[in-house]
Each structure stands twice: as C-alpha cells, then as structure tokens.
C-alpha cells in the first residue's frame, strides 16, 4: 500500500476537537466526505512526534478520551492507522525535556527516556510489571482495538456506511458526543458506536431503509450478534422499523458484529 499522507488536517484535527468537547462528533462525517477516492491512502493517527500527547494538560489531560477517538481512526475505513510510542500507556509527555521543554510532546531533539515505557520494560523483563492498574487496563483496550482492526475482514475489507445523517435530529442520540457508522463484508455487518462523553450513555440508533439497501442485508432478519470487545454472543436483529438501543460506557465504544 502506498501511503500518500497522514490525515492531520482533517480527521486528526476534527477528532481532537471532539475529544476536547470543542466540536460536535457529527463533524467527523465531513472528514471522510472530503477524502472520497483517496482515503485508503491516508494514515490515521491520534499522536505522533509533532503533536501533543492525549494525556497532556495541553490536550485532554486524560488518556481515556483517546479510546473512542482510536476506535473511529482505526475502524472507519480500510486505510492504515498508527499509534505512537507510549500512547497505549497513556504517556502524558509532560516531562521538562531539554530542547523541547514542557510542551505536552515527547521530544525528538533530545536523548530522553519515558517513565511509562520504562515501567513497561521493567528492567528488561518487558512484562509491564511496573505499570499502574490504569496503564495496564488502557494497554489492554488498545490491544483489543488494534487486534480487532487487523483481524476482522469486515474492517480490513468491508465497505463503510455513515449513520450520522439519520441521527442528527434523533432525541435519543447526542450527535455532539456520540458517533455511529456501519461496515459490511459478505454476510457480516458491523455496527460501531462510540461515546466521547465522560458519562455512560444509552442511545437509540436510527438505521434507515437506505442503509439496508446500500449494504444489501435484510431488514429485521435474525443474526448472531457478537460484541467484539467482550466476545459475548446473542441472537439479535436490526431494522428500520424501530431504533436499536445500545449502552455505551464513558469514553468508549461498542463494536457489534451481526453475522447472517
């Protein structure tokens, strides 16, 4: 795959603003719309050597808002995604580094050592033995997101369908703090809904007739529903007749795969 560019002025800037509650989540729709035809060649990211760390005081001040942002960045299309060294550990980038100073970034101009990575390395054991419980939990979530993104063909090869247009006026869905879309591959449909809010939310997602036609799957047809984050299975269905209710934890997302 030829990567032409990173999606900095677009998805990164937009998702960052949403994570900081400075823009509505619905703005994310404009990112893929502006890249029609070249999105598969763009590199998605939330941290890199130029940008401030999510957990820094200059950004979100907390690594958890990065989880819904990472789900969107990793699963919205088939293009590559990157995590930066220590992002999965909530590295804050708040050291007072030599040339760079205390700017919320990890210096590329100085010889420097990050406490979060040292704690994961654990004096050569590489077992995360010195990580905090919060760091271990965050790393597990990132590992799930990345492994799902690379192993599920509905993500690596599936088509994308944005559901935000059908939920902008939905009184049971906050388009400022939640974002929802679908992916489809063969007999699999993936419903992805994320919550950028600090509190758990119960939403009711409208899935229009157009979605069933565009993705070519049956309205109100029984399917095996798998929660990809937990592995739990049940029999469920999607329909345009009534909204689909989902409970989303704070700063998180639900990845519900329907196999027909």
Which residues fall in each region the model found?
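Short, small-residue-biased leader/transition segments that mark boundaries at the very start
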Residues: 1-3
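Acidic, His- and aromatic-enriched active-site or binding-groove loops in soluble protein domains
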Residues: 5-10, 107-110
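Residues at the C-termini of beta-strands that transition into short coil/loop
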Residues: 9, 46, 112, 226-232
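Core domains of carbohydrate- and sulfate-ester-processing enzymes
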Residues: 13-34
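Loop/helix patches that line or flank the sugar-binding groove of alpha-linked glycan CAZymes
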Residues: 26-27, 36-48, 53-222
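Short, P/G- and charge-enriched loop/turn segments at secondary-structure junctions
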Residues: 30-32, 167-168, 242-244
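Solvent-exposed beta-strand/loop surfaces of large extracellular or lumenal domains
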Residues: 221-241
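C-terminal beta-strand-rich structural cap/linker in extracellular carbohydrate-active enzymes
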Residues: 235-260
